[in-house]
């Protein structure tokens, strides 16, 4: 570990990140573990829970997503959930040990007509003693401020992949559209949850590029989710080759080094991994997971499995 590893840097070069990414695995893990020990000495693992508050029918054509109206995945579009149903889910999440509750809506952007109801959800979940997070697509001027006023802590808006590979995955929006919405959320004083998806056919250079783009956000995202692609029948990426677990762990270790003070979340795709593979990713630097049996429309490990996983790596809950 170098002294620069202890302080978040806004001046990472792509070449520097690539050099770290390509380190022998033992050296990479040793460096990541030293950073994790310096900033997260208790070894605790933060737990979030995710709920789809509006499922299906999205106008975007993200090649990985079951909720796009562009693909035949068998998923039916649904209306925005009642506030009471969302609050009930938040209470169950808290009872299960989650300290952050994330609400996701499948649409291109937040419409002003839906803003009051979403704001009510945020306020109600916040009143239950949970941190709040939403993922609502692109934001227009003034919307982020309204969400902040309602009590929003985090806005999730992933960059997905590198700038160069982005148009291979989605063509209904641009990489810079994502950057613009992140800027709106940050300007309103909302913390950022921003990461990407690995295993979409991208190269290692693209993974380096994603991490580099994230490092240019100032300040860094407070939460960096690292997702492993869950191939879904009917989507363009349904037949993607499965990402190697060691490659996923390598990416997580690099994220831990580049984002020393951020939560690095082992996110989607855990249900396809062995307990040993998940433990490796936590040991490599991840200190946050999603709990609950579903992540929007994909499966997630059962609570008892996660309890055994966290016990095996010695990671309790950070705030519970």
UniProtKB/Swiss-Prot annotation:
Q: What InterPro entries does the record point to?
A: Aldolase_TIM (IPR013785), BATS_dom (IPR010722), Biotin_synth/BioAB (IPR002684), Biotin_synthase (IPR024177), Elp3/MiaA/NifB-like_rSAM (IPR006638), rSAM (IPR007197)
In short, the EC number is 2.8.1.6
A Pfam family that this protein carries is: Radical_SAM
Supply the enzyme class, top level.
transferase
Query: Catalysed reaction per UniProt?
Result: (4R,5S)-dethiobiotin + (sulfur carrier)-SH + 2 reduced [2Fe-2S]-[ferredoxin] + 2 S-adenosyl-L-methionine = (sulfur carrier)-H + biotin + 2 5'-deoxyadenosine + 2 L-methionine + 2 oxidized [2Fe-2S]-[ferredoxin]
Q: Which residues bind [2Fe-2S] cluster?
A: 102, 133, 193, 265
A GO molecular function assigned to this protein is: iron ion binding
Q: What PROSITE patterns would the database entry show? A: RADICAL_SAM
Q: Which UniProt keywords apply?
A: 2Fe-2S, 4Fe-4S, Biotin biosynthesis, Iron, Iron-sulfur, Metal-binding, S-adenosyl-L-methionine, Transferase
Q: In which pathway does it act?
A: Cofactor biosynthesis; biotin biosynthesis; biotin from 7,8-diaminononanoate: step 2/2
* SMART domains the UniProt entry points to: BATS, Elp3
Where in this chain does the record put each Radical SAM core domain? 43-270
Please tell me where [4Fe-4S] cluster binds in this chain.
Answer: 58, 62, 65
- Give the CDD domains listed for this entry: Radical_SAM (cd01335)
| Example GO BP | biotin biosynthetic process
Q: Provide the assembly information.
A: Homodimer.
Instruction: Check the record and name the NCBIfam families matching this protein.
Output: bioB (TIGR00433)
Task: Give the UniProt family note.
Answer: Belongs to the radical SAM superfamily. Biotin synthase family.
- Role this protein plays: Catalyzes the conversion of dethiobiotin (DTB) to biotin by the insertion of a sulfur atom into dethiobiotin via a radical-based mechanism.
What's the name of the protein?
Biotin synthase
Organism of derivation: Hyphomonas neptunium (strain ATCC 15444)
Gene encoding this polypeptide? bioB
């Amino acid at each position: 570990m170098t002294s620069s590893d202890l302080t978040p840097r806004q001046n990472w070069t792509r070449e520097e990140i690539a050099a770290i990414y390509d380190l022998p695995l033992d050296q990479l893990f040793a460096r990541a573990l030293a950073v994790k020990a310096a900033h997260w000495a208790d070894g605790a693992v933060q737990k979030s829970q995710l709920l789809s508050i509006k499922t299906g029918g999205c106008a975007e054509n993200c090649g990985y997503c079951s909720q796009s109206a562009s693909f035949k995945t068998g998923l039916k579009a649904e209306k925005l959930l009642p506030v009471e149903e969302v609050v009930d889910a938040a209470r169950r999440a808290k009872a299960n040990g989650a300290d952050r509750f994330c609400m996701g809506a499948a649409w291109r952007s937040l419409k002003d007509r839906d803003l009051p109801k979403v704001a009510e959800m945020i306020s109600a979940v916040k009143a239950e003693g949970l941190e709040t997070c939403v993922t609502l697509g692109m934001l227009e001027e003034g919307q982020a401020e309204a969400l902040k006023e309602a009590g929003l802590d985090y806005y999730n808006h992933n960059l997905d992949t590198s700038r160069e590979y982005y148009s291979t995955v989605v063509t209904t929006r641009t990489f810079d559209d994502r950057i613009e919405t992140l800027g709106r959320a940050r300007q309103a004083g909302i913390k950022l949850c921003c990461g990407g998806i690995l295993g979409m056919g991208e190269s290692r250079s693209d993974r380096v590029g994603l991490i580099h783009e994230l490092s240019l956000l100032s300040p860094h995202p407070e939460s960096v989710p690292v997702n492993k692609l869950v191939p879904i029948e009917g989507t363009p990426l349904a037949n993607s080759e499965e990402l190697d677990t060691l490659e996923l762990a390598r990416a997580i270790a690099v994220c831990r080094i580049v984002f020393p003070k951020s939560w690095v979340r082992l996110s989607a795709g855990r249900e396809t991994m062995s307990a040993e593979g998940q433990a490796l990713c936590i040991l490599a630097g991840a200190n946050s997971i999603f709990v609950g049996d579903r992540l929007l429309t994909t499966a997630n490990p059962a609570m008892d499995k996660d309890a055994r996983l966290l016990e095996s790596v010695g990671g309790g809950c950070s705030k519970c």
